[in-house]
Regions:
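Trp/Phe/Arg-rich N-terminal binding region typifying the photolyase-homology
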Residues: 1-166, 463-468, 472
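A broad detector of short, well-ordered amphipathic alpha-helices
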Residues: 21, 90, 206, 328, ...
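Glycine/tryptophan-enriched, flexible segments
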Residues: 145-299, 409-410, 414-472
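Active-site-proximal binding-pocket segments
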Residues: 233-422
Length: 472
């Protein structure tokens, strides 16, 4: 008898799942599903408790949905990726599996694991799929068959390639001929978990699809005008579903073009499309430059920057107590919700690296440990952009002023007051420099003074980067 095994990883959905669809194509095959939890590996990769909670909930939803299709989900737990190789081999042997289907992951450890699995399954046909991207790595290359290192040329080539052939979404599988089955007992991950707002980050696949549809209908067209202002609900909030595979990027693309057909030609919706392409860009980069997975800077000379070791400053940044309101409000949003507005990710990253001169990798790790939408490629790409260490990054002399950033993107201080209750009584725009208002008003605030002087910090950072660059 032909037995197909679908190995789920970061693709926890029925709709538009390339590996699942391929496994179910043969209507006479027996289809099984497998998920392997690797808590120790997750801890090494700084997975956040909120993301673990989301995955746990999605797994239980997936188990029920698969059972309705007649597909049992086998759940196993081992320490790490190395141990998972033996589990796949064991499950295949116990169930006389003839074909293994899985969706590629592009990180170094994951790719090494998959190579070992295929090597161990000599009598099993293994098929992998580029499911987590719209266009696979290698599909968008320069004329010299090299990976693009600058986003805009990559984007232009990506759009050109897309117009040559739009990847379709595949349907959810039909019920197997054997009929529905009873789902197994609920899954509980052996990993720290923390609750989150399911209204913002839906657990059920159908709710994520509905959120995507709602955003593309009502938000994507105004995204360019709304996306930079954290007090406004101007972003999609779909990043967590994309990170865990509750949604596919193809679903996002097709829904966007269905609601905003001019997005491909620079019209309404095109800026959100650019965000999807940035996601592709960082994944393609990570595939071609695996050192990015190992926290190495893309620009080699930046590894010579003499970072400051200052635990007190790092902790103040982490806790949202730097004395700079927009930075602190953003960090408290992150700590309270597991999510941070994208503009604020840029501001807080710039502050850590270029005001405090703390190694960007400290920030990269902390973000991963808190974010419900933690994604190695996107998080690393964002931090290397802010630190001027990455490809197509901000130049090292571009240093955000945390006061003017607050004035520009939270003009009236609405977002700041939402997350810093100790500043609610500071009037108007004075909230961006509350220490000045407090001094004039003769008021003592329960809020710290700035931990660094921005002008002095800027000069110190410029000197550190210029010194590092001398040896280049």
């Amino acid at each position: 008898m032909t037995t197909h095994l679908v190995w789920f990883r970061q693709d926890l959905r029925l709709h538009d799942n390339l590996a699942l669809a391929a496994a179910c194509r043969n209507s006479s095959a027996r289809v099984l599903a497998l998920y392997i939890a690797t808590p120790r590996q997750w801890a090494t990769h700084n997975m956040s408790p909120r993301q673990a909670e989301l995955i746990n909930a999605q797994l239980n939803g997936l188990q029920i949905a698969l059972a309705e299709k007649g597909i049992p989900l086998l759940f196993r737990e081992v320490d790490d990726f190395v141990a998972s190789v033996e589990i796949v081999k064991q499950v295949c042997a116990e169930n006389s599996v003839t074909h293994l289907f899985y969706n590629y992951q592009y990180e170094v450890n994951e790719r090494a694991r998959d190579v070992e699995v295929e090597r161990a399954l000599r009598n099993v046909v293994c098929e992998g799929f580029d499911d987590s991207v719209i266009l696979p790595p290698g599909a968008v290359m320069t004329g010299n068959h090299e990976m693009y290192k600058v986003f805009t040329p990559f984007k232009n080539a990506w759009l050109k390639r897309l117009r040559e052939g739009m990847p379709e979404c595949v349907a959810a599988p039909k019920v197997r001929s054997s009929g529905s089955i009873e789902p197994s007992p609920s899954i509980t991950l052996n990993y720290p978990r923390q609750s989150f707002d399911t209204a913002h980050f839906p657990v059920e696949e159908k709710a994520a699809i509905a959120q995507l549809r709602q955003f593309c209908q009502n938000g994507a067209g105004d995204y360019e005008q709304q996306r930079d202002f954290p007090a406004v609900e101007g972003t999609s909030r779909l990043s967590a579903s994309l990170a865990t595979g509750g949604l596919s990027p193809r679903q996002c693309l097709h829904r966007l073009l269905a609601e905003q057909p001019q997005a491909l030609d620079g019209g309404a919706g095109s800026v959100w499309l650019s965000e999807l392409i940035w996601r592709e860009f960082y994944r393609h980069l990570m595939t071609y430059y695996p050192s990015l997975c190992k926290h190495r800077p893309f620009i080699a000379w930046t590894d010579r920057v003499q970072w400051q070791s200052n635990p007190a400053h790092l902790q103040a940044w982490q806790k949202g107590k730097t004395g700079y309101p927009i930075v602190d409000a953003a960090m408290r949003q992150l700590n309270s919700t597991g999510w941070m507005h994208n503009r604020l990710r840029m501001i807080t990253a710039s502050f850590l690296v270029k005001d405090l001169l703390i190694d960007w990798r400290e920030g990269e790790r902390y973000f991963m440990s808190q974010l419900i939408d933690g994604d190695l490629a996107a998080n690393n790409g964002g931090w290397q952009w802010a630190a001027s260490t990455g490809t197509d990054a901000a130049p090292y002399f571009r240093i955000f002023n945390p006061i003017t950033q607050g004035e520009k993107f939270d003009r009236e201080g609405e977002f700041i007051r939402r997350w810093l209750p100790e500043l609610r009584d500071v009037p108007g725009k004075a909230v961006h420099e509350p220490w000045k208002w407090a001094q004039k008003a003769g008021v003592k605030l329960d809020y710290p003074q700035p931990i660094v002087d921005h002008k002095e910090a800027r000069l110190r950072t410029l000197a550190a980067y210029e010194e590092a660059r001398k040896g280049d």
